Amino acid sequence: MKHFAAAALAALLALPGTASAQLAGEPFIHDPSTIMESDGKYYTFGTRGGGLVSEDGWTWHSGGERPGGGLAPDVIKIGDRYYVAYAVGGGGMNGGHASNIKMMWTKSLDPKSRDFGFHDVGVVASTDGVENADAIDPAFLLVDGRLWLSYGTYYGFIRIVELDPKTGTRLAGNQPVDIAIDMEATALMHRDGWYYLLGTHGTCCDGPNSSYNIRVGRSKSLTGPYLDNMGVPLLKGGGKLVIDGRGREFGPGHFGLIDLGGGMEKFSMHYEADMDRSGRSVLAIQPLLWRDGWPLAGENLKAGTYEIKSERSGNALQLNVDFTRIPFDVRKSFFAPAGAPIVSLPDQTLAEDQATWPKDKVAVDLGEYMIRPHQQWTITPVPNAGGYFGSPYYKIVVAGTDRALAATRDDEVVTAPSFTGAPEQLWRIDQLTDGSYRITPKVKSASRRDVALVAIGASTPTLATFDPANDSGRWTFKAP
């Protein structure tokens, strides 16, 4: 399983969108493990050893060391140890399904750290090549102080065993329990009294011809039975869709939970093929939503022009400028004669609306959306500005202009006459678990707090600490 604790990523508060779901750098990997923070960097490991490393969660490069090779590792941090599980053999490699899942641990994932160094724990699960199971694709879940490991592939059952969280060894006498079929690359989650088993269906390892997709079932008991949304047992091949291919990226698999806290969750995975990167397998990070008790993939915000609507009041973010009327004879509305011709009125133009705007900084407020130019915002990723967990930084400008939304040092928000690329003009936009978004400036406030765009009442936006318990810091983006 792939679960990332909130505390480990507190500094990275994520943003969704980009013109593409692609991460920056060289995020080439197959079967990525849980993303882990260690010594200020972020690591994920893949099949055959090695993996990827990132300093900001957005730009990834080859790095990290994982001895042992093998298939589809997973990582979990318990106390001061990082436990790593990986499979040796199986998976149909060389025609067989005999396999061992091995465990090791280290106190750092950074090869330059004095705490780096793997210690072998031994085999924690195995299959003999004859039984109806294949011990590969391990995944961890730590819940209520107990450590569990799921594993298996299409060849037979998905199984779960219990490990000792203090040593990483298999609990004495513990026997595997069969919990699903027709999936592989499983992951486990626990939320609101439910256990969720996610697994990858479809075919893999053939680039753009791969049909991998991620599905889920749930149970009140960790050992099952797991059912999908239609009541079909996962032991009979059931599974509710979480995500399939999107755009020019095919075959999502190997789900990994990233719980950032504050109503924000994401997940890592790989796409079997990114058509814009030679069809290679790549790391990807998506928002995770929850609807009616079920997880589903969110959408990274795409570059475009939007109305930015406050979930608190329903009002739209806008420049605080004088209202310019659209020329209109009211008598034509109330007293038009029968049979009068019907014509389409033009939208107000930017030039008409802009004529009375101040030339320097302009404040922003909230108002009823009336399709005015000063209520429309163009959002685009900023090249070479870096990023954060899963996304680049964005600029937010009044559509058709270079007037940019900016944070001030005293926790207010204004628009600057032009976009300069300064940190106060760079923004993160995180999709939350309910589908709304949080908007956060890159720059720290004078108090060094992490602040977000928040609505005070119906008409005043400001920067303040985000409170997931209410709607004041939640926003939606709608195409005009």
Where are these regions (language model features)?
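Positively charged n-region of N-terminal signal peptides that target proteins for export
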Residues: 1-4
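Bacterial N-terminal signal peptides
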Residues: 7-16
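Carbohydrate-active catalytic/glycan-binding domains of CAZyme proteins
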Residues: 20-329, 373-384, 423-428, 433-436, ...
